[in-house]
């Protein structure tokens, strides 16, 4: 079967950026930035994104482009005879399934809130207790949560079943274009609110006092973690898009564009959140409470809040759904390569698997609310811990070692693939950094995540 390919470079960049851009860009990056010295944190973040995130991104893409296959088969095509690197391909796919076990539920929350604002469920005069109660009611109703999760899964696999160009690429182009327009409109509106500039200053102006209080080591560690996790590396989520790429552009050049889009959305998200919260005297927090309690409380007290709430949750829906369909594509491509299934068969069978696997997360907030797993975490946080703290860093380390050691694919073959085409080239002089320093940085992140 002839390997599918992207219709355009723009399609590849927007699909890949859509995979990287997700909920964490909005509910984590702005908060961590504000708490860790503003502009100083952003500077360290950008340094680590270039020094850590971009190299590993090019490695995943290189494995995909050189092999023209999905996770397991890509290792088999490139590894030396008798070696076992392909075992990680199976682990990477497990990571993709596990990520979707909870990400589909959270993406469903975004869709639910878009329709809640559209219907006018959130009205002026509501306070933080009211918006908290509304979110609590959603979590307490397994049928409602399951409905929105099912909507997300069914729509996601419907998109992917239509093929790479007519499904994933076409929908991602539309969603990412709309997302970028929405984020600019929302940020401009937020910045023009009364008292909003104080929020902008807190968010982006370098704050040496905050850095001194927190400690420069902690700021650097936070920046390193954010830069590493933002691209969702380690579970072959990016590798699959490398397998659909052409050879006309270098991987560092294309990877830099993906990083730039991801960073733009993360920084702009803060320009929506901080000015609005400062304008209405609301304390900024992180995670689900920021998105589903704090910000709705801001919107309901804002002139035209129903419209702005709709636009924000449309943006969040696109941000989360772009990740969902990107990972679904990876899961389907794996099934097509490994078992010879058609796209429709891969979509149907994997759709059923993901629906069943997502049930524990849905029930974890109500029927199974007393169930605590890893370190006392609830179901969603336990699944997230497995993916974010174990599979992503370990997977990134495996891709790195595969690409730069003589026991794997090898540094020279990786560099030749990465530098094929026009654009930004990776210097061969970086070999010692890739072989000795970068693995230690990833190992540090892995150990930090377990402490």
Predicted regions and their residues:
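Membrane-interface "cap" regions at the ends of multi-pass membrane proteins
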Residues: 1-27, 56-61, 65-87, 246-250, ...
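Membrane-embedded translocation segments of transport machinery
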Residues: 2-6, 169, 173-321, 325, ...
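Helix-loop-helix connectors at the membrane interface of multi-pass transporters/channels
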Residues: 3, 73, 107-140, 242-248, ...
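Inter-helical loop and helix-membrane interface segments of multi-pass membrane transporters/permeases
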Residues: 3-4, 32-36, 66-91, 104-165, ...
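Loop-to-transmembrane helix boundary motifs in multi-pass membrane proteins
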Residues: 5, 11-13, 19, 142, ...
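Select transmembrane alpha-helical segments in multipass membrane proteins
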Residues: 5-16, 41-44, 83-97, 146-152, ...
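Transmembrane helix-boundary motif of multi-pass solute transporters/channels
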Residues: 11-48, 236-242, 253-256, 260-261, ...
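C-terminal membrane-solvent junction of multi-pass transporters and transport-like membrane proteins
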Residues: 87-93, 339-351, 382-442
């Amino acid at each position: 079967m002839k390997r599918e390919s992207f219709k355009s470079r723009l399609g590849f960049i927007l699909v890949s950026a859509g995979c990287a851009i997700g909920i964490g860009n909005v509910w984590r990056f702005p908060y961590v930035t504000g708490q860790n010295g503003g502009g100083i944190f952003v500077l360290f973040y950008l340094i680590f994104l270039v020094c850590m995130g971009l190299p590993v991104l090019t490695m995943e893409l290189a494995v995909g482009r050189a092999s023209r296959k999905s996770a397991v088969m890509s290792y088999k095509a490139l590894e030396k005879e008798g070696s076992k690197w392909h075992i990680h391909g199976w682990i990477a796919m497990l990571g993709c399934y596990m990520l979707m076990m909870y990400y589909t539920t959270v993406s469903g929350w975004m869709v639910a809130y878009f329709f809640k604002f559209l219907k006018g469920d959130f009205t002026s005069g509501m306070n933080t207790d009211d918006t908290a109660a509304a979110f609590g009611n959603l979590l307490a109703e397994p049928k409602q949560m399951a409905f929105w999760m099912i909507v997300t899964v069914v729509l996601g696999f419907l998109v992917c079943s239509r093929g790479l160009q007519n499904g994933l690429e076409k929908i991602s182009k539309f969603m990412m274009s709309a997302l970028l327009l929405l984020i600019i409109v929302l940020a401009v509106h937020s910045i023009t609110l009364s008292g909003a500039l104080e929020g902008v200053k807190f968010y982006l102006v370098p704050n040496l006092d905050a850095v001194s209080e927190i400690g420069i080591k902690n700021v650097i560690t936070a920046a390193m973690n954010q830069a590493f996790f933002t691209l969702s590396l380690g579970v072959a989520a990016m590798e699959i898009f490398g397998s659909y790429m052409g050879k006309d552009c270098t991987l560092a050049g294309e990877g830099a564009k993906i990083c730039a889009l991801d960073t733009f959305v993360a920084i702009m998200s803060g320009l929506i959140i901080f000015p609005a919260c400062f304008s209405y005297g609301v304390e900024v927090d992180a995670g689900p409470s920021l998105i589903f309690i704090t910000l709705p409380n801001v919107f309901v007290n804002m002139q035209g809040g129903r419209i702005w709430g709709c636009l924000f949750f449309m943006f969040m829906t696109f941000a989360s759904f772009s990740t969902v369909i990107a990972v679904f594509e990876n899961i389907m491509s794996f099934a097509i390569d490994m078992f010879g299934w058609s796209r429709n068969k891969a979509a149907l069978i994997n759709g059923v698997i993901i629906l069943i696997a997502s049930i524990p997360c849905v029930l974890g907030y109500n029927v199974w609310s007393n169930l605590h797993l890893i370190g006392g975490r609830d179901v969603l946080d336990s699944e997230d811990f497995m993916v974010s703290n174990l599979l992503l860093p370990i997977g990134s380390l495996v891709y790195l070692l595969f690409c730069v050691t003589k026991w794997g694919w090898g540094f020279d073959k990786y560099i030749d693939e990465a530098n094929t085409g026009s654009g930004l080239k990776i210097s061969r002089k970086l070999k010692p950094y890739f072989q000795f320093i970068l693995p230690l940085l990833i190992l540090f992140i892995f150990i930090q995540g377990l402490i």
